[in-house]
């Protein structure tokens, strides 16, 4: 912890116009990290081919040049100030990069229209490569944090992952008060992650239970930080709103407390901004009052509690002082921005001289099918999962005949229909004998894909951590697979993955997948199997788009391995057979490892960097094993898995997992009882709760769960060592792969 800090004077705060009741401090080493900021700027703009200026440093009275981190984490340990500054700066760069990309939505409309209807689209795969590079920059800092303090770094990553799973960039619509708005903003603002960052910087460690206890107090301070950001960013958000309206003809109202007050209390813009400032003070006073209440209830609090509170307080007061001076947030006066009002859910300039009618988007949706509109909208907004769209039309000049229900047949030539009768009128025969017309040879009309794709589209739409695509992107930093080939490989993996999930859920009699009904529960077994088969064929068709002659061989070999491994898993379950640990590992190497090998081998085959450095190591084999054993373990102990799949769902389906093998591999009476339960379990409906609890207790008593956990921790160490060996062969680090691994740690 820093031995001392610099207190910002009341005079300086008054000159800046701040209202926080918390003190404003700055780290004594604030000048030392300016060079870190410049290095991040140079690196990001060089890698991303941009010229972004985050404006996170400013010239402060009596201080000179300083960065926001020095104000928001003034008690940061001196040896951690640099990494906290770099992480904060990279976060600002990423925010600005994606914010600027949002302005380009109008271009994306045109590109996606051409893409959907066969035209030449802008190469988004190159953009995706740039995004991967930006993630690599951030990942390198996060990995460095793990080496400094793995416990606090992991706390931050868990918070980050939790927020990503539940957060969407929602709209103000439906929020009827500030009380509804503030929890919504806490969820998607990232302030909880910054609280963990501050704790990392200060070295403050609290248990999960302690954090939950202090949450109501800390949230009040976080609310004030959110409102501070809303107040200072408002003019910038208004400018962005009108820029987007000018470009596309529409825009969502800013997600900002100023809007909330204007809509719910009917206040003017100026009055609403003043209400925001008043609420900043109210939230901070509430925070301090709750601390005092806690002290009165419990007596003197642990020092770490006070530091935890200060982390939230200085984030608020420091960010306000910084925001009041930095040029990142221009004022309405500096923007020469008139007052705005809300009319029919839209922002309008109050001045009548300002043009009210926005320029409409150049490309319209007139004449485009509704299904295509939704695809384009979802792609432009970046919210859709990848859904296959393989449409084909009969060749020009093709002729086909179709029987129709009234006894006529339709001859279709070049898309024009000619109707002919068959000697019957209104169902009455005009002759003595029924004359039957045969369909002549010729092209046929393909059935639409909507029905066969429906189950696939459903499972592809479910929430997912998208581990496989992240793995592919991370490996591509080494392998340099051309963009089109990389896109094909991702589609191949997605088709196979979702196909296997649909079939697995049927084979396992599962009812939940990621907290939602399994596909076959909605579409039935037969239709789901048909969709899974179609996805498999689509994957094979995609392989033909790859350039390497070995691609088909790789695909067939690993898909065969996948099914061989699955056959062992299903056989053991059906016969209640307990394999040896070695047999189990062989099954995993085939069933789970096949997908990882398929990714790597296809990428190496298409790589612009000739090498076999990854598959020659045991890294991929270890990764497949870790992935499966971790899944076995989490299914039994994780509350998240319980929510998504049900309590100990593997026991319901009779799966022979590694913890179960450890439990029943001996000849003890307890092992025999567990075997008997599995042998006589109901095929449909799984096991009663009390039997699952009994089996779980036996796993705990026999040390099966602890043995599995110990093995996983040993494998974690081996995976990092294996990754470092691969990094040595490539001659470069891959922080994205390491970060992906560390996010899986148990």
Curated annotation (Swiss-Prot):
Isopentenyl diphosphate binds at residues 465, 468, 497, 514. It catalyses: isopentenyl diphosphate + (2E,6E)-farnesyl diphosphate = (2E,6E,10E)-geranylgeranyl diphosphate + diphosphate; (2E,6E,10E,14E)-geranylfarnesyl diphosphate = quiannulatene + diphosphate. Mg(2+) 3 binds at residues 504, 508. Mg(2+) 1 binds at residue 95. Dimethylallyl diphosphate binds at residues 513, 591-592, 628, 635, 645. Residues 338-746 are annotated as: Geranylfarnesyl diphosphate synthase. GO terms for biological process: alcohol biosynthetic process; mycotoxin biosynthetic process; terpenoid biosynthetic process. Residues 1-336 are annotated as: Sesterterpenoid synthase. Pathway: Secondary metabolite biosynthesis; terpenoid biosynthesis. The keyword Transferase applies. One of its GO terms (molecular function) is metal ion binding. It comes from the Eukaryota. Mg(2+) 4 binds at residues 504, 508. In the N-terminal section; belongs to the terpene synthase family. Bifunctional sesterterpene synthase; part of the gene cluster that mediates the biosynthesis of the pentacyclic sesterterpene quiannulatic acid. This is Quiannulatene synthase. The lineage of its organism: Eukaryota, Fungi, Dikarya, Ascomycota, Pezizomycotina. The gene is EvQS.
């Amino acid at each position: 912890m820093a031995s001392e800090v610099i207190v910002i004077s009341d005079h300086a705060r008054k000159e800046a116009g701040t209202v926080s009741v918390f003190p404003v401090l700055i780290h004594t080493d604030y000048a030392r990290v300016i060079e870190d900021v410049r290095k991040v700027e140079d690196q990001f703009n060089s890698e991303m081919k941009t010229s972004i200026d985050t404006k996170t440093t400013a010239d402060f009275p009596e201080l000179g040049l300083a960065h926001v981190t020095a104000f928001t984490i003034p008690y940061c340990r001196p040896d951690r100030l640099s990494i906290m500054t770099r992480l904060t700066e990279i976060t600002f760069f990423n925010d600005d990069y994606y914010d600027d990309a949002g302005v380009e939505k109008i271009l994306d409309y045109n590109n996606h229209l051409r893409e959907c209807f066969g035209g030449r689209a802008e190469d988004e795969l190159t953009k995706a490569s740039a995004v991967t590079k930006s993630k690599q920059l951030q990942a390198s800092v996060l990995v460095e944090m793990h080496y400094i303090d793995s416990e606090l770094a992991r706390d931050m990553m868990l918070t980050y992952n939790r927020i990503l799973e539940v957060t969407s960039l929602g709209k103000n619509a439906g929020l009827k008060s500030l009380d509804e708005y503030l929890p919504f903003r806490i969820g998607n603002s990232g302030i909880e992650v910054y609280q963990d960052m501050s704790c990392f910087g200060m070295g403050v460690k609290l248990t999960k239970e302690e954090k939950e206890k202090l949450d109501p107090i800390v949230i009040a301070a976080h609310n004030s930080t959110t409102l501070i950001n809303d107040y200072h960013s408002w003019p910038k958000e208004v400018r962005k709103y009108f820029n987007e309206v000018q470009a596309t003809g529409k825009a969502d109202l800013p997600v900002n407390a100023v809007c909330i007050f204007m809509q719910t209390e009917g206040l003017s813009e100026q009055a609403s901004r003043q209400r925001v400032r008043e609420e900043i003070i109210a939230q901070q006073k509430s925070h301090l009052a709750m601390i005092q209440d806690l002290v009165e209830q419990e007596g003197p609090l642990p020092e770490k509690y006070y530091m935890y509170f200060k982390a939230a307080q200085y984030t608020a007061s420091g960010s306000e002082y910084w925001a009041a001076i930095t040029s990142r947030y221009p004022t309405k006066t500096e923007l020469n921005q008139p007052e705005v009002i809300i009319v029919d859910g839209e922002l309008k300039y109050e001045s009548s001289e300002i043009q009210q009618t926005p320029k409409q988007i150049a490309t319209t949706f007139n004449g485009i099918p509704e299904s295509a509109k939704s695809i384009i909208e979802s792609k432009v907004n970046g919210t859709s999962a990848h859904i296959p769209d393989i449409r084909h039309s009969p060749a020009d000049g093709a002729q086909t005949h179709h029987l129709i229900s009234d006894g006529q047949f339709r001859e279709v030539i070049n898309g024009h229909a000619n109707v002919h009768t068959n000697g019957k009128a209104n169902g009455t025969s005009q002759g003595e004998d029924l004359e039957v017309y045969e369909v002549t040879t010729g092209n046929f009309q393909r059935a639409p894909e909507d029905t066969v794709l429906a189950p696939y589209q459903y499972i592809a739409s479910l929430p997912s951590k998208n581990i496989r695509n992240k793995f592919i992107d991370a490996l591509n930093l080494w392998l340099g697979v051309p963009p089109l080939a990389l896109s094909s490989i991702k589609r191949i993996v997605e088709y196979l993955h979702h196909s296997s999930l649909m079939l697995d859920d049927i084979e396992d009699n599962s009812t939940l997948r990621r907290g939602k009904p399994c596909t076959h529960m909605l579409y039935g077994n037969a239709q789901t199997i048909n969709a899974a088969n179609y996805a498999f064929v689509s994957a094979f068709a995609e392989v033909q788009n790859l350039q390497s002659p070995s691609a088909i061989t790789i695909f067939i070999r690993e898909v065969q391995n996948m099914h061989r491994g699955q056959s062992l898993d299903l056989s053991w379950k059906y016969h209640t057979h307990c394999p040896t640990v070695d047999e189990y590992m062989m099954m995993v190497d085939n069933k789970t490892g096949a997908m990882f090998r398929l990714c790597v081998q296809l990428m190496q085959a298409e790589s612009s960097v000739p090498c076999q450095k990854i598959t020659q190591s045991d890294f991929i084999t270890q990764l497949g094993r870790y992935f499966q054993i971790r899944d076995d373990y989490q299914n039994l102990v994780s509350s998240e898995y319980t929510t998504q799949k049900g309590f100990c769902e593997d026991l319901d389906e009779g799966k022979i997992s590694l913890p179960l093998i450890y439990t029943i591999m001996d000849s003890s009476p307890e092992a025999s009882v567990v075997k008997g339960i599995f042998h006589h379990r109901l095929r449909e409906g799984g096991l009663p709760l009390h039997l699952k609890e009994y089996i779980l207790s036996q796993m705990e008593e026999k040390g099966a769960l602890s043995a599995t956990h110990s093995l996983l921790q040993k494998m974690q160490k081996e995976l990092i060592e294996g990754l470092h060996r691969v990094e040595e062969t490539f001659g470069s680090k891959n922080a994205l792969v390491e970060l992906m691994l560390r996010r899986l740690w148990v």
